[in-house]
């Protein structure tokens, strides 16, 4: 009917193991989604997992690279969570194999209403007014932002 599928997981979420990560990777291979969103787990203080530690940026980058190898054409975002845990997390994600950025185009005045986790990245490079800064940061690592429709190439 004309839609595409996606799946994903949080890296370093409570009770996750190497085995569950292997199962997640196997599922991605079998399910064959058009997009897979993974990012490090970031606790939110008002949830049952609020006292757990955040996931690892390095492990997330490793898993992004594995997914890129397993599914060469998949749409693979460099998540805001990576940028929240590391000042150059988005760029590191792209260098590890991500090929999608999803900037938050909400006005800065409205961002507090959408707090998925504590200390969520919310900078000028995330707003529509500062898209040029995002383009420049991606250009600085040898890539460019494309704003055309982003269907997967099969």
Segments predicted by a language model, with ranges:
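Glycine-centered flexibility motif
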Residues: 6-8, 12, 39, 142
């Amino acid at each position: 009917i004309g839609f595409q599928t996606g799946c994903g997981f949080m890296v370093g979420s409570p009770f996750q193991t190497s085995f569950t990560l292997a199962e997640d990777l196997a599922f991605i291979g079998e399910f064959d989604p058009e997009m897979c969103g993974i990012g490090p787990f970031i606790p939110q203080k008002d949830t049952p997992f609020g006292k757990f530690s955040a996931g690892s940026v390095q492990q997330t980058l490793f898993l992004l690279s594995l997914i890129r190898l397993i599914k060469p054409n998949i749409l693979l975002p460099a998540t805001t969570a990576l940028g929240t845990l590391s000042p150059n997390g988005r760029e590191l994600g792209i260098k590890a194999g991500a090929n999608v950025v999803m900037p938050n185009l909400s006005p800065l005045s409205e961002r507090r209403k959408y707090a998925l986790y504590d200390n969520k990245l919310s900078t000028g490079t995330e707003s529509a007014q500062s898209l040029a800064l995002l383009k420049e940061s991606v250009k600085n690592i040898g890539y460019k932002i494309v704003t055309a429709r982003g269907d997967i190439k099969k």
